[in-house]
């Protein structure tokens, strides 16, 4: 197996994600992330937010753990504007999941306990919802998994804590690719391969991206196929056979 540097793998993936319909946005730090969030929420909600109004939105978002934030993401926020009128801010259009703003960025640096630079992030309406961690070909997937654990420990909560809105992680070394929901306690056992309708595993990053990371599909996974389990306060993402079974019932 040829060893492919992580950088090449990352650049190719970013290009591919753009061709699938994610707009590329350069975000290097939290300030840029916050500025982009404002413009994307304005676009999604077809309104303008003053700095004061946006500060209220940020305050509303910066609460709770991963589970509580998953709920905030799915609810609308009632905002009283400076002129006294009231509007609802939608963070995620769950009913028409294709009708959201889709972006991709890479190499975002966040500084918490330690400084971390993340590989590839998918943003929906400016919210970082999918984190993709890559290791060069030939390296163990567990390394990428452990890397995501370090990010969560060291820097996801920094600043306005926007990275705590991550719903799904994707880890890949190019030839093997898995996905899993974001939770407080993570186990490598809870990472899954995606499959096609005939239950054939899709392991290659390129094929996985085409099937799973296409904007409408990844948005549908987040909106419809992540279950917020109240009892354990965890996010549960459906596995392929559960996904196809549910889709068949709906059809």
Residue ranges and their predicted role:
Residues 2-251:
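ATP-dependent helicase/translocase motor core
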